[in-house]
Amino acid sequence: LSQTPKPANREIVSASLRLLAMRDMSRMEFARKLAAKAFTPEDIAAAVVWCEADGWLNETRYAEVTARRLGHKYGATRIAQTLKQKGVPNGAVAETLSAMKDGELARAQAVLERKFRDAPSNAEQRAKQIRYMQTRGFSFDVIKRAMCAAAAAGAALAEPFEADD
């Protein structure tokens, strides 16, 4: 435990621990939830400092957990946007996204495969798939590579069946 003194208001200590025991959250989100309970700004500031010093409130951990949770559905752009909306500092966002960068293509392929079972047969379907993936926060480069990989996998699966004709 840290040397930071516990806030004098016992109610805010109890409320803080209850909130943070449920799930991780950013400083901004934590302060907003405490403010909704009508605590004074001074008590909220003291609680934030105390929780950070004792390791209850950790924005880097929050960013990692949130990115992992959202990573199955969304790309780096959307994850970064969500983290910034929650008040996570840019440094923590960049650090988290750089750790996830290697798996971006695999995640895009999984999302593409879950939503669209078949490769696009015309330009309209291709544009629809690209738009869908862009709204999910994947970059055009990653989308293009994921679609090429899916098309190559589909062609490889289809070749033996076509040869039997």
Predicted features by range, described:
Residues 1-165:
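An alpha-helical, amphipathic repeat domain used for nucleic-acid recognition
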